[in-house]
Design a protein with these regions (language model features):
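N-terminal alpha-helical modules
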Residues: 16-104
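N-terminal signal peptide c-region/cleavage motif recognized by signal peptidases
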Residues: 12-14
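Sec-dependent signal peptide recognition
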Residues: 1-7
Length: 104
């Protein structure tokens, strides 16, 4: 009975997810995808602080379309998502540099 009670209590206790221990740029496809998405999240957050929501939405749509077209030959491969996310990040960072230049 105690074992059942313990099992019941463990099943309702909150579990805290830990961030994976990955050293970027990563050693395999999964790790590289993770690293690429982390970099994209950083550049995307920086753009959110610089652009109006409407401009950001337009920018994101354009970069997604351009990057998807640029890497279309790899669409069936496991590396495709990483390449598209990395492309989005690179374009974001170029725009951030341009915006920085305008503010000086």
């Amino acid at each position: 009975m105690k074992g059942l009670l313990l099992l019941l209590l463990l099943s309702v206790m909150p579990v805290q997810a830990e961030q994976p221990d990955i050293q970027c740029p990563g050693q395999n496809t999964v790790e590289r995808r993770f690293c690429a998405s982390q970099k994209w999240e950083e550049s995307n957050q920086a753009l959110k602080e610089q652009l109006e929501p409407r401009s950001l939405k337009t920018w994101m749509k354009a970069t997604q379309e351009v990057c998807a077209a640029a890497y279309a030959p790899y669409r069936q491969g496991t590396i495709y998502p990483q390449m598209v996310v990395s492309c989005d990040d690179r374009l974001n960072r170029v725009l951030l540099e341009e915006l920085k230049g305008l503010g000086e």
